[in-house]
Amino acid sequence: MLKEFKQFIARGNVIDLAVGVIIGAAFTAIVQSLVKNLINPLIGLFIGRIDLSNLTLKVGEANFRYGSFLNSIINFLIISFIVFLIVKAVNKFTKKEEEETPAAPTETDYLKEIRDLLKEKRSIK
């Protein structure tokens, strides 16, 4: 069982996934810093408050922290857009690679070639 686990872990997909998760976590920290330190102050200039995370709505005893929710939305939109750009670039690269690789002959192609050779052989006789 341990041997199977080692084989599973050593497969490329699992290692790629692990690297992706680690890079994603680091990237999330960068985006959160971008939102907190650059984007929120810019938005704050227009609404008169620098720190959006402190925006709240008090209804009775309930305190709704919609500013933190806005920060999360901004983080999500930035991360989603960058992931979209990465996927788009990867798809473009993969598509070019597929176009450059000539298609291998199919079974039908081989059968047509055999048929043509047989016709040619019969016409020679």
Swiss-Prot record:
Ordered alphabetically, the record's keywords are: Cell membrane, Ion channel, Ion transport, Membrane, Transmembrane, Transmembrane helix, Transport
Q: From the Swiss-Prot or TrEMBL record, state where the protein is found.
A: Cell membrane
Where is it mainly found?
Answer: membrane
Please give, as recorded in its UniProt entry, the membrane topology of this protein. Answer: Multi-pass membrane protein
The terms describing its cellular component in GO are: plasma membrane
- Statement: the UniProt record of this protein carries the keyword Transmembrane: yes
Question: Transmembrane stretches, by residue range?
Answer: 14-34, 67-87
- Positions of disulphide bridges: none
Could you state a single Gene Ontology molecular function term? mechanosensitive monoatomic ion channel activity
UniProt-listed PROSITE patterns: MSCL
The answer to keyword Ion transport applying to this record is yes
Q: Which Pfam family is one of those matched by this entry?
A: MscL
Its function?
Answer: Channel that opens in response to stretch forces in the membrane lipid bilayer. May participate in the regulation of osmotic pressure changes within the cell.
Q: How is this protein organized at the quaternary level?
A: Homopentamer.
> What family, per the record?
Belongs to the MscL family.
Indicate what this protein is called per its UniProt record.
Large-conductance mechanosensitive channel
